[in-house]
Amino acid sequence: MLTTDHLDDVIAGLSFLKKLPHVDANRIAIAGHSFGGQLTLLAAERDSSVRAAVTFGAAAGSWEDWPELRERLLSAVRKTSAPLMLIHASNDYSTAPGNAMAAERKRMGKPRVLKIYPAIGKTSEEGHNFVYSAVDRWETDVFKFLDANVR
């Protein structure tokens, strides 16, 4: 995860979007879930034109067991200038990643929003995947965040 082609693919996708005539290259946000949330943070760090980044359950399943990943993602949230919205359900595998990254951004005085929603379903897996099953819970908050930071 720390050095993979996946991030290069995301960056290539962003570059492609910027070339499309109907895309305002100055108003691009990026979002991702789980591993995609990790890539979202790394892409926002690498591409300074990203205006906002939203993560759902980023690193929730690997934060405690992978110190290199923790430090890499904390480094990314330190370096990116894009406002971050970090989202978990309270019954995600772990909410520690969002809490730690939001605390780091706060310490640095950088824009961030941390949202921990009430438990979705009964299991950690259901909590982790609420991005798909409970859009009505998060969509208003995410669109307000994007309106405030990308418009």
Residue ranges, per PLM feature:
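C-terminal catalytic histidine-bearing segment of alpha/beta-hydrolase fold enzymes
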Residues: 111-151
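Alpha/beta-hydrolase fold nucleophile elbow
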Residues: 22-34
